[in-house]
Swiss-Prot record:
PROSITE patterns: GATASE_COBBQ (PS51274). Belongs to the CobB/CobQ family. CobQ subfamily. This is Probable cobyric acid synthase. The gene is cobQ. The keyword Metal-binding does not apply. GO terms for molecular function: ABC-type vitamin B12 transporter activity; catalytic activity. Catalyzes amidations at positions B, D, E, and G on adenosylcobyrinic A,C-diamide. NH(2) groups are provided by glutamine, and one molecule of ATP is hydrogenolyzed for each amidation. Pathway: Cofactor biosynthesis; adenosylcobalamin biosynthesis. Keywords: Cobalamin biosynthesis, Glutamine amidotransferase. It comes from Picrophilus torridus (strain ATCC 700027 / DSM 9790 / JCM 10055 / NBRC 100828 / KAW 2/3). Disulfide bonds: none annotated. It holds the Pfam family GATase_3. The active site is at residues 319, 419.
Length: 469
């Protein structure tokens, strides 16, 4: 089995991006490649063809590798819910919410899931590019970190350390990580990522790191402005200047729904009711805690301001945001609340009911005949507990399972449970007036990324790691 582990000095150092680049580089060289991340904590997930839920980062990496996305590529997905709990998803299926201690007890007993996933992928692919999580030097998590050195140690996998120079202190972070991490003998190279300016300024530091640690620099990768989905909320701290406002509530999830708008600088975050004056279109995104987020926008005046905008501005709700637009949200089973029933914004004549069975899966659809007069079809995915049981509006879509979504009588309020709807060229054009080829943007970004990384690293040294794997 050949596997290379991509570790980082910190979160957001560029592990996901470089793992994506490595997947495409090896694919172009003729290898059958699979991405892998043992444990990912992210609210940016996607439901793949078989209904499994995985992190969107591994989905992008699979695209770069030319591989069919699989739950084995991300066997453990943690989706923070607040209140010190996360929804735990094992091999694509939710097993419920857990606090940190319950999760560690579970994963300690079931760590074999990680090894079994690697073994499954190794039987199908030539090379696995395994991405770590956070940093391998979190000494407070020694013995409980199953995303980094645990994976490397299973098969003595060679590792590359990614360090972000853009945030400063790059040599201190490299030196400190190497000296604090377990099994530093498996670390073969490090990469300095996100470099701006003259690279020669780094050479004395690179020489000194080699003297102190014996570790060589595999390359210096420049800062690259890419149009690729981010892994978590850290990747979505943008301030746009467009006319489409996205309501930013505390438990917002599936940020990647808005990549098409962000890529073209069409969107900004609505953080208070005054921001609503700037936009022509208001979008309520998905939420990991619909009840809390609805209370949040009620308490700060955003909800009342949205109601006053009804009929003047287009209002779109996706998943949890769609539920908020309805008349009522009922959770007698206590899935996301204490078993309460609360009023929504009342802009759509629908009611949502929660049950303990989670709906996940890819969706094929065509646009329904309604006031919007949008033609075309597409694919998306659903990830939700709440079901729209009462819907007295015209549907937005027609899926294999029947009508889906809602469109108000005046066509100004739209709701859907289908994520990825903004990636549809016709829907994007309807709300922006412009054309978008989302798939082509992603593919071109992956190609650009792989080309720059290949030129920036010692490619021979990288390929030699396959002999050590």
């Amino acid at each position: 089995m050949k596997m290379i582990q991509v570790l980082g000095t910190s979160s957001d150092s560029g592990k996901s991006t470089l793992a994506t680049a490595f997947c495409r580089i090896l694919k172009d060289l003729g290898y059958r490649v699979s991405p892998f991340k043992a444990v990912n904590m992210s609210l940016n997930s996607i439901a793949i063809k078989d209904g499994s839920e995985i992190a969107r980062a591994q989905w992008v990496q699979a695209m770069a590798a030319g591989a069919e996305p699989s739950a084995y590529m991300n066997p453990v997905l943690l989706k923070p819910e607040g209140h010190h709990k996360s929804q735990v998803i094992i091999l694509g299926r939710s097993i419920g919410s857990m606090g940190i201690n319950d999760y560690y007890n579970y994963i300690n007993k079931n760590a074999k899931i990680i090894k079994e996933s690697i073994d499954f992928l190794s039987n199908k692919y030539d090379v696995i590019i395994s991405e770590g999580a956070g940093s391998p030097a979190e000494i407070n998590l020694a013995g409980r970190d199953f995303a980094n050195i645990y994976v490397s140690s299973l098969y003595n996998t060679p590792a590359i350390l990614v360090a972000d120079i853009d945030r400063g202190g790059v040599f201190a972070s490299i030196y400190g990580t190497i000296n604090l991490m377990q099994r530093s003998d498996l670390l073969k190279y490090y990469i300095i990522n996100k470099m701006r300016g003259d690279q020669s300024l780094l050479y004395p530091g690179i020489e000194r790191i080699e003297e102190l640690t014996g570790k060589k620099c595999l390359g210096i990768v420049p800062y690259i402005d890419l149009k690729l989905p981010g892994e978590d909320s850290l990747d979505y701290n943008f301030s746009g200047s467009g006319s489409i406002g996205i309501v930013r509530y505390p438990y917002m999830e599936n940020y990647s729904d808005f990549d098409p708008l962000i890529f073209n600088e069409k969107a900004f975050y609505i953080k208070n009711k005054e921001d609503l004056k700037r936009c022509d279109v208001i979008i309520l995104p998905g939420s990991k805690d619909v009840f809390h987020d609805l209370e949040y926008i009620n308490s700060n005046g955003i909800a009342d301001s949205i109601k006053r905008c009804s009929g003047e501005k287009m209002i779109i709700g996706i998943c949890g945001g769609y539920q908020m637009l309805g008349k009522r949200i009922n959770d007698a089973s206590g899935v996301e609340s204490d078993g309460v029933s609360i009023p929504g914004l009342g802009l759509l004549d629908i009611e949502t009911y929660y049950n303990k069975t989670k709906t996940t899966g890819s969706v094929k659809y065509r646009f329904a005949e309604n006031q919007l007069k949008i033609n075309g079809s597409g694919t998306g995915y659903e990830i939700h507990y709440g079901s729209i049981v009462k819907n007295n509006e015209m549907p937005l879509l027609i899926t294999d399972h029947g009508p889906e979504g809602s469109v108000s009588s005046n066509g100004m309020v739209i709701g859907t449970n289908v994520h990825g709807i903004l990636e549809n060229n016709e829907f994007y054009r309807y709300i922006t007036g412009e054309y978008l080829d989302y798939d082509n943007i992603i593919e071109n970004s992956i190609e650009t990324l792989a080309g720059i990384v290949k030129k920036s690293i010692n490619i021979e040294g990288f390929l030699e790691l396959l002999n050590d794997a």
